[in-house]
Regions:
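Bacterial Sec-dependent N-terminal signal peptides
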Residues: 4, 16-41
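Glycan-processing catalytic domains of CAZymes
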Residues: 29-421
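Alpha-helical transmembrane segments
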Residues: 11-15
């Protein structure tokens, strides 16, 4: 998602609120002396007690039959094929499970196979990706919905229908997650889009319900940047409007929402408190296990306590790490977050993201070694630190993290998932 903010802002946020940075080592809290909180606001449902992945579904290609008919999100210049000088991604996908792929201007993979990419518009692509979710114990997907007007509107509408079909076929829940970044008439557009288009999906047996209500998430209220210029009053109006329509409303909010500083606008706490569930953003905030520990001690525990004290469910983010930035530590970084958020007492977990090849934070199948990367492309593979990992490793790791979160396996600071099955 388009959610990485100014580096100086992020650095300041980590330093002031966590007492740590990439150069500061925070001791790991002892696993055997920490009590796991069991706070609950809402009973188990389709988001409480569950692990949800953020699902972009925003890749297309020329010739895929999509309304956009461009290399949507694969490239900077969508009208041209992906190439080393025209790319929009940081990680290379593993495409072996897809029946239809599309050409690029990259050299062949190092194994000699053509370097091709998938299209999210293909029914088989969406189906196989939701099959991966089901096979790996992922409970649901939050379909990202950016401003559905203009050039991207028709393909985004089509993706909602495709996600519904795939979710129903594979027994995976889904819900709509609006990203309001850059919306200029946000209040009216959200209400119109929900009323005229998206609310119809709530009749699907696969549409997520919590407390008997259809789930909708709004990402972007309160962020302190020029892409989210909304007043607290306007945002509160939208939250209350969705709730008046019978929805359970999740807020994708700034990391420092509770203190109303750094990435959060001031005077927004009353708006944040109106959400039924809060999911603070974490991409760009931590890059290793030590920093996850720092956030657990200095931010997550206090966030959970505040939510509990105010009748709000808490759904923190977990990320695999930017592969190209060498953050993953063959899964140890992500596992530490599962461990810490379980100890924090979170009511739900949000994985950011499923298919975020653009920022290198995807858990979907990825090139496992240089054999599956275009020759001369400089993309790192999952084995970048010398540990061999299967293409589906982060799907399997997420599945084990979900089992631990749901109490199906004991809590442990030691990653149980083997990089190679």
């Amino acid at each position: 998602m388009r959610k990485i903010f100014n580096v100086l802002l992020i650095t300041a946020a980590i330093a002031t609120s966590c007492g740590c940075s990439k150069k500061t080592v925070v001791p790991t809290p002892p696993a055997d002396t920490t009590t796991v909180k069991t706070h609950t606001q809402s009973p188990p449902g389709d988001v409480v007690g569950k692990v949800i992945v953020g699902y972009q579904g925003w890749f297309a290609a020329i010739g895929d039959g999509s309304p956009i008919n461009r290399y949507w999100h694969w490239t900077q210049i969508w009208e041209q094929e992906p190439s080393p000088t025209n790319t929009g991604i940081r990680s290379w996908p593993d495409v072996r499970d897809y029946t239809a792929t599309f050409p690029t201007q990259y050299s062949n993979l190092n194994n000699g196979q053509p370097a091709t990419v998938f299209s999210s518009f293909s029914d088989q692509t969406v189906d196989v990706q939701f099959k991966w979710m089901k096979q790996n114990g992922i409970d649901g997907a939050a379909l990202q919905r950016f401003n559905p007007s203009g050039l991207e509107g028709p393909v985004r509408d089509a993706m909602a229908a495709k996600v519904k079909t795939a979710a129903e076929a594979n027994g995976v829940k889904f819900y709509i997650m609006y990203d309001v970044s850059g919306w200029t008439t946000m209040q009216a557009d959200l209400k119109t889009d929900w009323t005229s288009k998206m609310s119809a999906y709530t009749t699907s047996p696969a549409y997520a319900k919590q407390n008997g209500k259809p789930v909708v998430c709004i990402w972007g209220f309160g962020f302190n940047d020029d892409n989210h210029n909304f007043s607290a009053a306007d945002c509160l109006d939208v939250i209350k409007w969705f709730q008046s329509k019978g929805c359970y409303v999740i807020g994708g909010v700034p990391t420092h929402w509770r203190d109303e500083n750094s990435d959060s606008r001031p005077d927004f706490l009353g708006t944040y408190k109106a959400f039924n569930m809060l999911s603070p953003w974490m991409v760009g905030r931590i890059a290793n296990a030590n920093e996850s520990d720092g956030f657990f001690v200095n931010v997550n525990k206090a966030d959970e306590a505040y939510c509990y004290g105010n009748g709000i469910d808490y759904q923190p983010c977990i990320l695999p790490g930017d592969l190209q930035g060498r953050q993953r530590a063959h899964g140890d970084f992500m596992w530490r977050q599962f461990y810490n958020m379980k100890r924090a007492g979170a009511q739900g977990l949000y994985i950011s993201m499923f298919d975020e090849y653009n920022e290198g934070n995807q858990i979907a199948k990825t090139a496992e070694s240089q054999a599956f990367v275009p020759a001369g492309s400089n993309f790192l593979a999952l084995d970048e630190d010398g540990t061999a990992c299967s293409a589906d490793y982060y799907l399997r790791l997420t599945g084990d993290g979900a089992k631990m979160f749901r109490g199906e396996i004991p809590i442990t600071a030691t990653r149980p998932t083997k990089p190679m099955p």
